[in-house]
Each structure stands twice: as C-alpha cells, then as structure tokens.
C-alpha cells in the first residue's frame, strides 16, 4: 500500500490546484447542508406551531387559509355552551375568537412591510400556551404587542420594535406595549392587536376563526360533529396540527426548489473539480509509471489517488462546517407567514461530511482511472 504521507505530499506540491478543489468541495457541502437545514427548519417550525389539543373553527371552504375565512360573531359563545370537552380555566372555556389579517405596518420614519396581524383577546394566552410575554404587557386599546422575531419578518431594526415605539396601521398610530415569544413556532413573528381594535381598523364584522383548546384530543370528534350538525353556522373544524401540516405541504415545492438549486450548483462544481483533477493527474502520468515500476500495481495507485481527492473533499467539508457554525447557525429566514431559524443538527453535519467524501470519491475516480489506463511503457515514455 502506498503510504498515506505520499498523498499529503502530493497535495502540498500543488497548493493552487489543491485550494481550488477544496474550495469547490466547500461550496458543494455548504449548499447541501444549507438546503437540508432550510427544509428541516421550515418543516419543524410549522410542525411545532400546532397544538394537538387545539382545534381551529373556520368558515366552510376556508380550511386551507384562515385569512380568507369568515366566522360569525357569537360562534365562540355558541360553541362554549354546546360542547362539554373544552378545557376550563378559572371556570371559563378556552375559546379564542381571532382575526388573522395580512396588512402593511409602517414605522414613524415611513418604512413599511407586510405583517401577519392577529386580533386577539386575553384568552388567546390560554389557548396558545407556547406564547410567553417577555417584556411589557398584553395590549390595551390603541396598543400592539409584537413577537420576538417580528423585526426579522418585517425587515425593521430591532430598536424600531421596542416597547414604547409607535407603528402605523391603516393610518392609526399604535404603541408597542409588549414583546412575546413562542419558541420554535411561526407565532413569534406575528403582531398581536386587541380583537375589537382590529375589527374597527379593517372594518370587519366577522371573525377569521375560533381556536378551541380541548381537555383531550378525542373530544375533537364531538366538536367536528357539532360543526357538521349546525349547517346554519357554515363551520368546519380542523385540528391545529393538521392545519399546519397542510401548510407544510403547501410549502413543499419551495423546499424542493432549495434542493434542486443545491443539486444544479453542485453538478457545476463537480464538473469543475473533474477538470481540475484531470489536469492534475495527467501531469503525473510519468510518476504513476515509476510507481508501477517499483512494484505497486494500478489498483493501489488508484486507491491512493482516490484518497487524495477524498482528503480535499473532507477538508472542504471542515471549512463548510466552520462557516455554518460561525456564520449561518441561528440565522432567521423570513417567509410568507413567519420566520424559521436555521439549525445545523448533527444529522445535517453528518450529511455534509458524507457529501464531501462522496464528492471526493466520485470526482477522483474517472480522472484517476483515465490516467492509469495506458500500459507501463507508455506511461514511462510520456512527456
């Protein structure tokens, strides 16, 4: 077997080509890990948002979009008096009538952005139990409460969404009264407004939905039967987890586009690496002949060349690891209904290492085999 140190020396003898191969491997591994992290983060964020005990009551025909839904006022009271399996807190049912509205928010300096605004009452904190008020308090009339990551979704500076700052919505100036979080969900990129205020600002008479928290998941059947029995109310019951699962399916093409872009760019980098390896190995044909002449067969030389290219792939992977850990880890990425946070898990890092190794093997095999095909006399006579 050719010594491992021989492979290292060959890489150091051609630092320019080695750096080119390492950079190409780094780019490919970085793209693959970023695509994997985006897919995982978006899917996990949407999955975390749904509570298995929560049911969303929406208008018939609006099961896939709460924003388009219309539910008559008073439905929450009707449901509370008709269904026995609703969780009670302080002798009150956990029912949250809500309006979900996509609208433009502006800062005082005129910067505007589209926000997902949720009109709620205090009971929303009972229903959405992941929500915690970090600073300040729940908004009173004329006030607004923002999620911890709302500034990322809106593209505003963090300082513009601090307590006491003013945001403008539909010509109304709203004072920020509190900041909340809901770790790992899309909720913490939302903006919450008192329900009655939002109905006034948007001139709406109906709700978007009613979110109900049940004592146990099997009580959903009673709630579903109620909506099917009361045809006059034109309601549909959908479990919150199922709603966000459908949203995740809706965003699946976007996640696939990330993979496709990573794949296409990786193919380009792979061909660039193949060209570099062909040039590098072709200039060493005489060296390969000399190694065969002293007793090493072609398979051992082939293995040594694959080890060389694999080393460049693994070094590129290590560089990519450094970039994701120091720069990309924890970055927030906005999308239409919120933000998700990139998280490079151990599985994703292992995928990156495997990609670098496979890239080295696949990239090194064709040029290595092509250079070892000539007979020993031909390689020794090669210029």
Regions found by a protein language model. Give the residues of each.
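Short cytosolic juxtamembrane segments of multi-pass membrane proteins
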Residues: 370-383
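Hydrophobic alpha-helical transmembrane segments of multi-pass inner-membrane transport and secretion
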Residues: 15-42, 252-287, 310-319, 362
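Mechanotransmission and gating elements of multispan inner-membrane complexes involved in transport
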Residues: 83-86, 106-112, 138, 150-152, ...
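Hydrophobic alpha-helical transmembrane segments
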Residues: 4, 18-22, 322-323, 346-354
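Short beta-strand boundary microenvironments
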Residues: 114-157
């Amino acid at each position: 077997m050719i010594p491992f140190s021989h492979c290292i020396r060959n890489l150091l003898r051609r630092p320019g080509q080695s750096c080119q191969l390492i950079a190409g491997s780094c780019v490919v591994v970085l793209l693959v890990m970023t695509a994997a992290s985006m897919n995982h983060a978006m899917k996990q964020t949407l999955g975390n948002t749904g509570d298995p005990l929560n049911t969303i009551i929406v208008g018939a025909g609006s099961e896939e979009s709460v924003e388009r839904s219309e539910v008559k006022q008073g439905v929450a009271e009707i449901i509370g008096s008709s269904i026995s399996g609703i969780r009670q807190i302080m002798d009150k049912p956990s029912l949250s009538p809500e309006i979900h509205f996509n609208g433009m928010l502006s800062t005082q300096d005129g910067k505007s952005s589209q926000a997902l605004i949720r009109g709620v009452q205090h009971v929303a904190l009972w229903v959405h139990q992941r929500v915690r008020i970090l600073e300040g308090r729940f908004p009173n009339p004329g006030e607004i409460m923002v999620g911890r990551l709302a500034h990322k979704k809106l593209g505003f500076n963090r300082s513009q969404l601090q307590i006491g700052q003013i945001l403008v919505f539909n010509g109304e100036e709203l004072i920020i009264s509190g900041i909340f979080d809901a770790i790992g969900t899309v909720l913490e990129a939302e903006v919450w407004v008192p329900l009655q205020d939002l109905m006034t600002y948007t001139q709406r008479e109906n709700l978007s939905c009613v979110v109900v928290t049940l004592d146990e998941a099997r009580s959903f059947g009673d709630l579903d039967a109620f909506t099917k029995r009361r045809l006059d109310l034109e309601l549909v019951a959908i479990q919150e987890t199922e709603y966000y699962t459908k949203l995740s399916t809706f965003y699946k093409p976007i996640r696939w586009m990330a993979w496709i872009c990573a794949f296409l760019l990786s193919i380009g980098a792979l061909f660039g690496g193949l060209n570099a390896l062909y040039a590098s190995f072709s200039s060493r044909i005489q060296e390969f002949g000399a190694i065969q002449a002293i007793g090493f067969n072609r398979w051992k030389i082939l293995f040594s060349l694959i080890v060389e290219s694999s080393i460049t792939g693994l070094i590129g992977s290590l560089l990519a690891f450094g970039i994701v850990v120091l720069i990309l880890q924890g970055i927030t990425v906005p999308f239409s209904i919120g933000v998700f946070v990139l998280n490079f898990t151990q599985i994703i890092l292992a995928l990156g290492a495997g990609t670098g190794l496979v890239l080295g093997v696949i990239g090194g095999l064709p040029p290595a085999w092509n250079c070892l095909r000539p007979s020993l006399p031909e390689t020794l006579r090669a210029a």
